[in-house]
Structures are given as C-alpha cells and as structure tokens.
C-alpha cells in the first residue's frame, strides 16, 4: 500500500466521524502529514484535535499510522531489491547458482571480493546488503500479512487487549493530569482506589500506575483473570470462525438417519393387511416411546425436587448460621430481579380509567345516576373500539358528499376522523353524528340527564319549603291526663289476690304421695318415691 491508499482509507473513514467532503479530508491529511514530519505521535495528536477523543477516532488514527509504517517498510524493501538487481556482480550471480544449503549457511558478515569495482560503479547508490537477508525476510512478512488478513476484527481487538494487560514494565510512562477532561476516562479503572485521582486513557494504558500516589490501578490477580477471560473469548471466536469456514468450504456434516420401513408383498399376500400390521407396529412403538419419556420426565422431576429440597435445607442451615447474610442475599436477588424486569413491571395499561365516569355518581348515587354513568361508559368503549379498528386498517368510510359530473363521473369526498380525542362527550350534538347506535345512546343519555335534573330540582324545592311552624307542631301532640286511684279499691284488690293465691296452694298436690295406712310397708313407700 502507498501513501495515496492511506489517504483513500482516511477519505472513507473520516466522514463517519465528521461530516466532511472528500476534498476537505484530502486537505486535512496533506496538512497533517506535511506538518508532522512522519512522526506517529504528532499525527495522532493532530488528528485527535480535529476529530475528537472518541473510540472511532482512536481506531482511525491507529490504523492510519499502521498503514504509513507498512508503506515505509515496503518502500525500503523495494529500493533494496532494485539496487541488488542493478548492482549485483558476476561473482554473486555465480554464488547464487550454488545449492540452497550452502547459500543459507553463509554468514552475514562475509564481504564480497570485488568491493573496489562496486564502489567505482555505484558511487551514487547506497550500500548493498547481502541478498540472503532480503530473500529470507520476504516470506516471513508475507506469512504475517496473510495471517493478519485471515483474522476477524474482534480477534484483533482481543489480541490488542491481551498485549496491553501483559505483565511487563513499559518504558514509556506518561503522567497526565487532565482528570478526564481532555482525554476519555480509563474504563477499566476510572479512578485510583488509594487517592481517588481520575485516570484518563493515556495514563492508564501507557503507565498502568497512578501518577499521584504511584499505586497500581489494576491488581495482578485482576489482570490474570482478565487475560484468561479474553483468551477464552478468543478461543470461542476461533472455533466459531473455523466452523463457519468449514461450512463455507462444504465440509461433510453428519446427517440424521431416517428410519424406513419396507413392506414385501408376494403371492397370496394382502398388501392392505401388511400395511395395517406395520401401522399397528409403529403406533405401539410410539406408545412405548411416549411412556418411556413420561417415566424419564418423572425421574427428572423427582431429581429436581430433591435438589430443591437440598438447596432449601442448605439455605435453612445458612440462615441458622448467619441470618443477616441470608437477608442481604435475598434483598440483592430481589433488586436484581426488579432491575431485569423494570420495563415490564413499570408499564401500566389502564384503559378502563379513561372511560370511568363514576366520579360524578359516588357510592350513594341514585339508580338514574348509575344508569347514566353506565351509558356513558358503554358509549366511550364503543368509540374506543372503532378507533382501534381504524388504527389496524379496518376503518369505516364516512362519505360526506357525492357529486355526479357532466361526463357521468361520480366523485365522493371523505373526511378523516379525529382519533386523538377518544373520550366521547355527553353533550355532543346529535346532528353531527351519523352512527345510529351512538345517536340512540346519546338520546338516552340526554333523557336520563333531564330526569335527574328534574328530580334534583324538586328535592331542592321540597327542602327549601320545609320551615318549622310552632302552631302546626303543637297540634300533633295531646296534653297528658292523670287519673287518681281510691284507697278502698286498692285494699279490696289486694285481698282478692291473696285469696286466689291460697286457693291455688290448697288445690296443688305434692308430687310424692305416701300411703297413710299403717298396714302398708316401708318398701312400697320407697318404691313409690323412686
């Protein structure tokens, strides 16, 4: 790749970061390359000043510098190969015809014999190196380029992260006190855990330590864990890419074997009877498989129940040991569950509240008021269903006018309905409505409202007419009259009551009757009592 191809890469990538035209991008690249003297750090800083400190801009700068470095190396190789072709003497040509083993075993410090002739013939040309170095380096570079092209982009990112997290001291340590204002914050360790300093990307990547207290931002254990995770992801991606390549190359994938049944018919055999036997056999086999699956399912359920019981017992044991830890774990699980299901848990769909008219009625509303609220709710629900049908494309067309032209052409005009206001008003004009059901409901609503208003007005008049009248209230009650009793009559009544009481006592017989005859025995009297 040449410098022009690097600029072409910039022309493709820069418009994704900033809305610039092709000419502006070319001018920007030429200006940066001319003022930076091919220094990668200066090129990166100037591009970042223009493009901003974002992920896309960092990726673009790294790729651009890589392309420029590859260009320089390739140009040097090409110049060396050209000089070798033009300046190689005859003695070197003869040596190149020797076997490859001798050619490879030659030392790089050997000098050609005819150096004087070379100096005379190539005064304006640079010094020539042995050809074995160039021939050996070319296949290595080609292999590396071939390997890098075959990898995925995500694998390259993982390799870069692994290299960054390797446990080795980097010589180029930089301190940056921007506190994340100029450069983006280091996501892995945004601030130091010892002094609290905010760490930017430059300080985190290049140094790995805090510039204030000189403590490590990431511990050794965390680094090793991150490297293991990245290696695991890399292996997974390599496996997926290899499987995709095998599938694209048409690798043999094992197919599932299909069961086939054959029916042989011979002389004197009924084919339909053989088919019936085969179908019965297949049904019995399926029934056995179904029963087997049921048994396996029951076993799995038993195992799951046993595992749950074991977990519950362990849970209770832990609760007995440390109840505070158990309560904290349950709270954490509940909060994580709420976090996962927050979108569904906070979504409230309450269509009935939009059409609820019970605020006017209350708990002690009359029968007419409740009927009026029900009619309003039914009308609103019907209107809402029509609006939903219109949203789904099953709307009714309302023709306003129909005109017949001179050529016999009929034109019909249609008015779009207002779907924003879903709640139907109870005081709508009947002349503006074309639906017969809606008109009948509205008439009924108006009649109920008029009846309710008349009853309320009559009740108000009745309450207003009620005033306390002393004379009218006095006529409702009669004056009490007191009767005086004579003392003689009271004494006579008392005597008659005493005589009646004595007569009742004389007439009563005792429950236990004992024979008065002396001849009767005591045993008979006891038995009579019992």
Curated annotation (Swiss-Prot):
It comes from the Eukaryota. Residues 75-153, 290-323, 479-502 are annotated as: Disordered. Residues 75-86, 106-121, 290-321 have a biased composition (Basic and acidic residues). One of its GO terms (cellular component) is nucleus. There is a cross-link at residue 509 (Glycyl lysine isopeptide (Lys-Gly) (interchain with G-Cter in ubiquitin)). GO terms for biological process: positive regulation of DNA-templated transcription; rescue of stalled ribosome; ribosome disassembly; ribosome-associated ubiquitin-dependent protein catabolic process. GO terms for molecular function: K63-linked polyubiquitin modification-dependent protein binding; zinc ion binding. It is found in: Cytoplasm, Cytosol. Keywords: Cytoplasm, Isopeptide bond, Phosphoprotein, Ubl conjugation. Transmembrane segments: none annotated. Residues 88-104, 123-139 have a biased composition (Polar residues). The modification Phosphoserine is found at residues 426, 431, 434, 457. Disruption phenotype: Defective activation of the ribosome quality control (RQC) pathway. Mildly defective ribosome stalling induced by RNA arrest sequences. Sensitive to anisomycin (stalls ribosomes in the rotated state). Its main location: cytoplasm. Pfam families: zf-C2HC5. Component of the RQC trigger (RQT) complex, a multiprotein complex involved in the ribosome quality control (RQC), a pathway that takes place when a ribosome has stalled during translation. Specifically recognizes and binds RPS20/uS10 ubiquitinated by HEL2, promoting recruitment of the RQT (ribosome quality control trigger) complex on stalled ribosomes, followed by disassembly of stalled ribosomes. Component of the RQT (ribosome quality control trigger) complex, composed of SLH1, CUE3, and RQT4. Interacts with SLH1. Interacts with CUE3. Interacts with HEL2. Associates with translating ribosomes. Present with 1710 molecules/cell in log phase SD medium. This is RQC trigger complex subunit RQT4. It comes from Saccharomyces cerevisiae (strain ATCC 204508 / S288c) (Baker's yeast).
């Amino acid at each position: 790749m040449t410098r022009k191809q690097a600029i072409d890469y910039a022309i493709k990538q820069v418009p994704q970061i900033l809305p610039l035209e092709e000419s502006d991008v070319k001018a920007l690249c030429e200006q940066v390359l001319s003022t930076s003297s091919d220094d990668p750090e200066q090129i990166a800083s100037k591009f970042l000043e223009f493009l901003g400190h974002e992920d896309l801009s960092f990726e673009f700068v790294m790729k651009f510098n890589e392309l420029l470095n590859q260009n320089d190396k390739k140009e040097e190789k090409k110049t060396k190969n050209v000089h070798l072709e033009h300046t190689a003497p005859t003695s070197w040509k003869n040596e190149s015809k020797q076997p490859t083993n001798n050619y490879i075993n030659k030392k790089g410090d050997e000098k050609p014999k005819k150096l004087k002739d070379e100096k005379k013939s190539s005064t304006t040309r640079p010094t020539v190196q042995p050809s074995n170095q160039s021939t050996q380096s070319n296949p290595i570079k080609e292999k590396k380029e071939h390997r890098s092209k075959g990898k995925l982009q995500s694998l390259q990112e993982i390799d870069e992260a692994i290299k960054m997290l390797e446990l080795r001291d980097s010589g180029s340590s930089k301190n940056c006190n921007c506190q994340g204002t100029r450069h983006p914050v280091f996501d892995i360790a945004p601030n130091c855990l010892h002094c609290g300093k905010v760490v930017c990307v430059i300080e985190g990547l290049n140094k790995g330590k805090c510039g204030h207290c000189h403590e490590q931002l990431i511990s050794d254990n965390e680094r090793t864990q991150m490297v293991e995770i990245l290696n695991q992801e890399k292996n997974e991606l390599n496996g997926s890419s290899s499987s995709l390549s095998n599938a694209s190359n048409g690798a043999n994938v094992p197919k599932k074997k299909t069961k086939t049944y054959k029916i042989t018919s011979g002389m004197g055999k009924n084919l339909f009877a053989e088919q019936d036997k085969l179908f019965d056999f297949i049904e019995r086999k399926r029934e056995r498989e179904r029963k087997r699956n049921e048994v396996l399912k029951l076993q799995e359920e038993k195992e799951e129940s046993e595992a749950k019981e074991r977990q519950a017992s362990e849970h209770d044991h832990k609760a007995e040991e440390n109840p505070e830890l158990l309560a904290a774990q349950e709270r954490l699980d509940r909060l994580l569950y709420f976090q996962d299901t927050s979108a569904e848990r906070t979504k409230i769909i309450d269509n009935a509240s939009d059409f609820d008219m019970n605020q006017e009625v209350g708990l002690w509303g009359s029968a007419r008021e409740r009927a009026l609220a029900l009619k309003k709710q039914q009308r609103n629900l019907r209107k809402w269903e029509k609006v939903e049908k219109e949203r789904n494309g099953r709307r009714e067309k309302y023709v306003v006018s129909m005109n017949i032209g001179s050529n016999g052409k009929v034109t019909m005009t249609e008015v779009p309905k207002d779907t924003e206001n879903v709640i139907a008003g109870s005081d709508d004009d009947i002349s503006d409505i074309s639906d017969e059901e809606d008109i009948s409901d509205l008439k009924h609503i108006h009649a109920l409202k008029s009846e309710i208003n008349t009853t309320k007005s009559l009740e108000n008049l009745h309450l207003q007419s009620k005033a306390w009248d002393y004379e009218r209230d006095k006529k409702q009650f009669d004056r009490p009259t007191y009767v005086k009793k004579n003392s003689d009559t009271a004494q006579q009544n008392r005597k008659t009551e005493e005589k009646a009481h004595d007569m009742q006592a004389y007439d009563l017989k005792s429950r236990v009757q004992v024979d008065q005859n002396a001849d009767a025995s005591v045993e008979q009297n006891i038995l009579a009592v019992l």
